[in-house]
Amino acid sequence: MPLKPEIQEFLKLRAAANLPEVFQVPISVFRAGTQNHPILAAKLPDIYLVEHKNIPGPTADLPIRIYRSTNETNTPGLVFFHGGGWTTNFLDTYEYALRNIANLGKLTVVAVQYQKAPEHPFPVPFDDCFATLEWVFKNCSKLGINPNQIGVGGDS
């Protein structure tokens, strides 16, 4: 099956621009590019509550965000780990999506800003995520989350 014409045109323009491959760019340059994402300028969906906290991690305190769609207790929960190959992206990039997930799913979402490689090599980012999951389980009652209805998700 041939590619759609708009995809062919995009690939042609990208090739003509002679852009470096992701692995050829310093990580600081690549990260800076993710901080200019158009979604950061979008109007954010209304939500009942967004709470910013720091929780203890294995090697450092970890910033988390808690998105509550309602003031009800005993709601389902989702612990969300953002994509980026353990090296890029940050919570602000996901603000729009996480508000929507919480609202549409009628649940509480907890997302973590885990430490990134190469400054913090694997398994540090994974350990940060796992510590966040453990923290959520230990704090279900404070978070208003039903401990029998916790999911784990993310993107890559």
Q: Where do the protein language model's features map onto the residues?
A:
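A glycine/proline-hinged amphipathic helix-loop "lid/cap" segment
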Residues: 1-66
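Short glycine/serine/threonine/alanine-rich loop segments
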Residues: 19, 107, 145
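Short strand-loop-helix active-site module centered on a catalytic nucleophile
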Residues: 64, 79, 101, 122-156
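Short beta-strand element of the alpha/beta-hydrolase
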Residues: 74-84
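Structural signature of beta-strand start/N-cap positions in the alpha/beta core
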Residues: 77, 106-108, 149
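Conserved catalytic-core motifs of eukaryotic protein kinase domains, centered on the activation segment
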Residues: 90-92, 120-122
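Short amphipathic alpha-helix adjacent to the substrate-entry channel of hydrolases
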Residues: 91-111
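Short beta-to-alpha linker loops that shape the active-site pocket of alpha/beta-hydrolase fold enzymes
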Residues: 113-117
